[in-house]
Amino acid sequence: MTETLETPVKIVPRLKTKYAETIKKSLQDEFSYANVNQVPRLVKVVVNMGVGDAAKDSKLIDGAVRDLTLITGQKPQVTKARKSIAQFKLREGMPIGAHATLRGDRMWEFVDRLVSLALPRIRDFRGLNGKQFDGNGNYTFGLTEQVMFHEIDQDSIDRVRGMDITVVTTAKTDDEGRALLKALGFPFKTEN
């Protein structure tokens, strides 16, 4: 009796497919790039959760690590204080936050969930500020609570934590980065 082993089919994230099939071509036409490799693309997404109160209570960092693990799908790295600051009762090496760097398919799936599920769940959401680019096509924005992600059970959170999300692109200018993120579905506020 012989058995055939089936290799698991690799599922490509839908936003990555959309980028490859439609967005790449439209950006190349819009900015008239000579080479397809000049078209801006996503490099990585960094999700950072600062827990300043962890200086007083070190157990708070565990909740941030747990939340970030659920949101990003990978174990975050704990950020430790580089310098001691007496006014904040902070010592060098104390845990003060956590961050996770997403690349590849995890990054595409996170951006898809962020744009299509998490951002629409924010109360009184009017769109992201389009002026928070760094001058090199990278975009950073903050979220005030972690409850908007459907992976987080609203009854099990110990406290509300905000987070910073940085989207790093290969765009050379802010306009190119904004066009890429808008094509990926980021809801920017309309300029009045």
Curated annotation (Swiss-Prot):
Species this chain originates from: Paenarthrobacter aurescens (strain TC1)
InterPro entries in UniProt: Ribosomal_uL5, Ribosomal_uL5_bac-type, Ribosomal_uL5_C, Ribosomal_uL5_dom_sf, Ribosomal_uL5_N
An annotated GO cellular component: ribonucleoprotein complex
Pfam families per UniProt: Ribosomal_L5, Ribosomal_L5_C
SUPFAM superfamilies: RL5-like (SSF55282)
Family (UniProt): Belongs to the universal ribosomal protein uL5 family.
This protein's name: Large ribosomal subunit protein uL5
HAMAP family: Ribosomal_uL5_B
KW 4Fe-4S (keyword) present: no
Subunit structure, interactors included: Part of the 50S ribosomal subunit; part of the 5S rRNA/L5/L18/L25 subcomplex. Contacts the 5S rRNA and the P site tRNA. Forms a bridge to the 30S subunit in the 70S ribosome.
GO biological-process terms attached to the record: translation
Reported function: This is one of the proteins that bind and probably mediate the attachment of the 5S RNA into the large ribosomal subunit, where it forms part of the central protuberance. In the 70S ribosome it contacts protein S13 of the 30S subunit (bridge B1b), connecting the 2 subunits; this bridge is implicated in subunit movement. Contacts the P site tRNA; the 5S rRNA and some of its associated proteins might help stabilize positioning of ribosome-bound tRNAs.
Superkingdom assignment: Bacteria
Molecular function via GO: rRNA binding; structural constituent of ribosome; tRNA binding
Taxonomic lineage: Bacteria, Bacillati, Actinomycetota, Actinomycetes, Micrococcales
Keyword line: Ribonucleoprotein, Ribosomal protein, RNA-binding, rRNA-binding, tRNA-binding
